[in-house]
Amino acid sequence: YIILLYYVIKQKNRFKYLQLFLIILAVILSDFVTSSIMKPFFERLRPCHNNEINESINLVGVCRGMYGFASSHASTTFSLATIMHLFFKKNKIFIYLFVWSIIISYSRIYLGVHFPLDVLAGSGIGALVSLSIFESQKIYFKNNV
């Protein structure tokens, strides 16, 4: 994250601090939607807390939190990858953030703390939040600058 922060701050454009704010906002909002809205609303148990299947999964580590729909890890990583890609399309290095997001998301399934649908929904929420923020700022600046 420090490297990404450095990359944004070293940009030579007058909107770099606004971009940094919007990147942080996208990640926080993605986490809020999944953790504070979706998980309490759907109350879908994590695989490791589901008595019907928890004996058939290979739990690696500790199972925290009762509910897993949708994955906050997937949401925040895909949110970051999406908004970084949208802001810095010319720099192809940010494509690797999507690879990183996929690895993080897969790890949630592998560790037995999320179902595949939890991760898919989380990644979609993260990408959608970032796309919404990016498009909103484009509309705002088109009309006000």
Map each language-model feature to its residues:
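Generic beta-strand or strand-like secondary-structure segments
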Residues: 24, 36-37, 79, 83
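Transmembrane alpha-helix boundary/anchor motif
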Residues: 3, 32-37, 128-135
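Membrane-interface interhelical connector segments
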Residues: 42-61
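Transmembrane alpha-helix/helix-exit interface in multi-pass inner-membrane proteins
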Residues: 28-48
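Membrane-embedded catalytic cores of phosphoryl/pyrophosphoryl-handling enzymes
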Residues: 57-145
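Hydrophobic residues in alpha-helical segments
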Residues: 9, 41-42, 109-110
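Interfacial segments of alpha-helical transmembrane regions
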Residues: 5-34
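Hydrophobic, aromatic-rich transmembrane alpha-helices
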Residues: 1-11, 77-85
